[in-house]
């Protein structure tokens, strides 16, 4: 698909469905993959599945000291991060008028502020090497909004604006910054939806099915590869036509 042999990638949120799929696809293309997450058992299971060329980097992204240490450890243990995939994210849904400050704060902290801090840590070294790929996994919700998710949508829209600005700042250093925005993707969470709930979702998707983690991961692999060397500041939407942007 996209040749990544010898490239070193750090994938945050690799213990989740999309993050795990991204790690698998990058690894299959020859990359050495650093797996970040908070669910240690899932990370270890994924590492066992992948075999060699894998390193684990557990960290709590809500803790700024752990975020800084994550960047430093990944740089040291991987001997330089060539590909940074900011995929980790959380939700704390609720109607705006009932949303508590802590629910706003933690979503912005993990989804947006931790991404800023980790990217800053890694980018400093990418600039020194004059090479790098930064891919931020946002969401269709960041582009079109979603009731009950003002905090989540704000964080994901923020990632898109962040990526466009950073892309302009570091393009001359041979570093690209792009986003992948998934729509409804098959996961343990969507598996719990009943038939009526799934039917309602399908009406909004012209392709009439949910996407797979591998389809999202394939877009990430493209942006990480030399095939996308002339692509920066862009968002690839993987949503089955749910939002044609």
From Swiss-Prot:
Protein name: Nodulation protein G
Entry keyword annotation includes Oxidoreductase: yes
Organismal lineage: Bacteria, Pseudomonadati, Pseudomonadota, Alphaproteobacteria, Hyphomicrobiales
Keywords (A to Z) from UniProt: NAD, Nodulation, Oxidoreductase, Plasmid
Top-rank lineage group of the source organism: Bacteria
Family membership noted in the UniProt record: Belongs to the short-chain dehydrogenases/reductases (SDR) family.
Entry's Gene Ontology BP terms: fatty acid biosynthetic process
CDD domains linked to this entry: BKR_SDR_c
SMART domains recorded: PKS_KR
Task of the protein: Proposed to modify Nod factor fatty acyl chain.
Gene Ontology terms for molecular function: 3-oxoacyl-[acyl-carrier-protein] reductase (NADPH) activity; NAD binding
Binding site for NAD(+): 11-35
Binding sites annotated in the UniProt record for substrate: 139
Catalytic site: 152
Any matching Pfam family: adh_short_C2
């Amino acid at each position: 698909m996209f040749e990544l042999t010898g490239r070193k990638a750090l994938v945050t949120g690799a213990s989740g469905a999309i993050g795990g799929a991204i790690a698998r696809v990058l690894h299959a293309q020859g990359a050495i993959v650093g797996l970040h997450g908070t669910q240690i058992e899932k990370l270890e299971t994924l590492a066992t599945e992948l075999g060699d060329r894998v390193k684990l980097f557990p960290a709590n992204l809500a803790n700024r000291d752990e975020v800084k240490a994550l960047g430093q450890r990944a740089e040291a243990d991987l001997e330089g991060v060539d590909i940074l995939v900011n995929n980790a994210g959380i939700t704390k849904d609720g109607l705006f008028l009932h949303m508590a400050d802590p629910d706003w704060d933690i979503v912005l902290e993990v989804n947006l502020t931790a991404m800023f801090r980790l990217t800053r840590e890694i980018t400093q070294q990418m600039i020194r090497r004059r090479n790098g790929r930064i891919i931020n996994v946002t969401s269709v919700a960041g582009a079109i909004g979603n009731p009950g998710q003002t905090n989540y949508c704000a964080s994901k829209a923020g990632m898109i604006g962040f990526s466009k600005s950073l892309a302009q700042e570091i393009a001359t250093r041979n570093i690209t910054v792009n986003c992948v925005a998934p729509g409804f993707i098959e996961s343990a969470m969507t598996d719990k939806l009943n038939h009526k709930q799934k039917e309602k979702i399908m009406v909004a998707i012209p392709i009439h099915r949910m996407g797979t983690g591998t389809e999202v991961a394939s877009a990430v692999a493209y942006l990480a590869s030399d095939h996308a060397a002339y692509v920066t500041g862009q968002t690839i939407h993987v949503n089955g036509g749910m939002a044609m942007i």
